[in-house]
């Protein structure tokens, strides 16, 4: 299950999406997520899925690989679904179980929230899979650069966010190694109910934290050895600049938003 995590990983390639400016990809990802959260019906989510599928095909990413990235988050998605189903108020009852009444409005809201989480993860995964860590850092820094007038540490924050994002697959890989090592010594992580399996994961925490701090210390020493001093007077190997590909991406996103808006007006 851990190997299915796609968030934070980079998939090298030379597609149109890979060659786009990281600033534009960040902006378009945010706009896409906001657009998805504005959708209020199933046809709108079908449009969002179709648009995402086209982007994935253009970027050369395996769509099945992206879908598998949802698997490790199925418990969070299921928990969100059940929470909204049980506690969201509604007026059209569908089923009564004791003192709990399930309504049509609650069912719709639960489905919509679950779909939003799925599109949030998949959209963010497309961004990280098509953008290298260095490009992501430069893009975040350039987008936040106007805040430097207020003494905001744009470069440092961008670096922290990128390192944290890139640490996700590393920590998951380390967890998988530790789990396999303990299973070779007789540990059982697969039998029993969900609570028992959760308790069996507790012995993984200590070696995982030790490994995480060791990696963080190694990274800090490597940056110190290279005389890293933050973003002041920092040069770049490749300067960022917008191209026709970015204009094409912005136009495609505008078309997506127009379709979402028109569909909402027609069915709303």
Place the predicted regions along the sequence by residue.
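Transmembrane alpha-helix interface motif
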Residues: 1-42, 48-57, 142-152, 156-159, ...
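Membrane-helix interfacial "entry" motifs
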Residues: 14, 37, 60-65, 97, ...
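Alpha-helical transmembrane segments and their membrane-interface exit regions
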Residues: 51-61, 76-79
């Amino acid at each position: 299950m851990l190997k299915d995590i796609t968030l934070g990983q980079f998939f090298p390639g030379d597609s149109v999406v890979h060659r786009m400016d990281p600033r534009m990809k960040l902006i378009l990802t945010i706009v896409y997520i906001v657009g998805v959260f504005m959708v209020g019906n199933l046809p709108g989510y079908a449009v969002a899925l179709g648009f995402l599928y086209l982007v994935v095909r253009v970027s050369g990413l395996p769509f099945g690989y992206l879908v598998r990235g949802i698997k490790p988050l199925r418990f969070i998605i299921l928990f969100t679904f059940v929470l909204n189903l049980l506690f969201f108020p509604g007026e059209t009852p569908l089923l009564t179980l004791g003192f709990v009444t399930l309504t049509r409005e609650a069912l719709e809201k639960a489905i919509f929230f679950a779909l939003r989480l799925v599109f949030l993860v998949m959209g963010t995964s497309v961004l990280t899979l098509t953008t290298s860590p260095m490009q992501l850092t430069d893009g975040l820094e350039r987008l936040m650069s106007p805040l430097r007038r207020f003494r905001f540490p744009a470069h440092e924050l961008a670096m922290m966010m990128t390192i944290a994002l890139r640490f996700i697959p590393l920590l998951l890989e380390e967890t998988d190694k530790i789990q396999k090592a303990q299973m070779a010594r007789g540990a059982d992580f697969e039998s029993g109910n969900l609570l028992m399996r959760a308790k069996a994961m507790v012995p993984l925490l200590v070696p995982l934290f030790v490994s995480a701090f060791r990696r963080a210390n190694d990274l800090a020493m490597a940056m110190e050895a290279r005389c890293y001093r933050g973003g002041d007077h920092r040069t770049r190997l490749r300067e960022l600049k917008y191209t026709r590909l970015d204009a094409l991406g912005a136009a495609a996103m505008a078309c997506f938003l127009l379709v979402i808006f028109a569909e909402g007006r027609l069915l709303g």
